[in-house]
């Protein structure tokens, strides 16, 4: 196939990623104020709307695994164009939906295609351009994922104030169409990543069954108790299937996902931080906002949450400044502390005042923007860059489960615990505080017990594919007296086909590890 006229141009490729990721992520956060309007127009119950959102989130989580499998055996850039086209189809179906069935199908397709595009496009943007562009990619990723979510409440509030919903969905469809056009303009044919890789569909099946069950159970919490069979059985069963997927991929000789190489100090710390920050941040702001829905107009309430978006922009700039330094690790720590502070501000007075709501959402925005994206790169830099797609897939699967499944559970706690919504929200916010604090303490403890002095990433080494950007010690290295151990991060690297093995070109493990350590 012919190359697009903008092939190799970073601004066009970055714009394509932005247009691909922003629609669904912003829409998922904008739905709350317009949900009653959509339900009334399409003759849906609020429970049906909850189920639609849950299945769309399940599609987002499953797509991360499906994208990796398809990338191994099908031309990657051609698949990216197909994903973008399907995103347009889903967006148009949702925007023009005459009834509930079309809306649910379109919205689920939006969630699925967004994660397919994330896994197909973002790793290529990271490794296909020069190192000088890498910090810009990190900043763009931060704004796309977290800035879009933070902007959602204001966008939804503006649309709710106009007493409609279709204009917003048509705008989303237009942005998706721009992503499709840009994917064609930047097209450069790329072969499958590894046709000899496993074709086993079981990992995708486990992910699909687990996510659908988990998000179905979470969505049913709107009208059922937590211990009702229709909620607790799919919740527990879905979570169990996801655990089975992780264990199965860890033990597999030819895995689809790189689980075993992530089992050292820095990747585990990064993944735990990303999950805890995602689970606590989205829920905290949304829970506090619910208490103010009867006091303010949707636009006013959206403006009170707008500081979260400003904070996401600030943390994107900070990420760019520290990206090549050891400050990357300290940015994550500072982000988690800011997140904890924001949760405490929100729960200090319920319902919160306008000042407390704005201040709390700003601190939460600083927290999630300063922790999740940097933590993803901390995990990714711990492996060779050829494993980046697989690393992003497993991290986004876990982050998506944490962000979208915990929220309905905490919302159920806020509605049912205590004698009033304020009392229930107070309890739910303390749970958010506990999640964020536990994740922070766990990560700091792993650094201490692993004997880690935060390193600066050796980006040249990582970009060349020779070795990880730094050496990540085994878990609990100090307790296990790993100063004499021979287990190194580098031999655990995952090649393009998902095989585990030592350094390339027949090099021994020791020189490869030394090279990575010397570069940092």
Where are these predicted regions, by residue range?
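Helix-loop-helix hairpins in multi-pass membrane proteins, especially solute transporters
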Residues: 57-60, 64-201
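Glycine/proline-centered helix-kink
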Residues: 32, 119, 140, 145-157, ...
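N-terminal membrane topogenic signal
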Residues: 3-17, 200-202
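Transmembrane helix-loop junctions and nearby membrane-interface residues
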Residues: 68, 95-102, 184-187, 218-224, ...
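Intrinsic disorder in cytosolic terminal tails and internal cytosolic loops
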Residues: 1-9, 446-520
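12-transmembrane solute porter fold
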Residues: 10-27, 31-42, 46-56, 65-68, ...
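Hydrophobic transmembrane-helix bundles of small-molecule transporters
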Residues: 157, 161-272
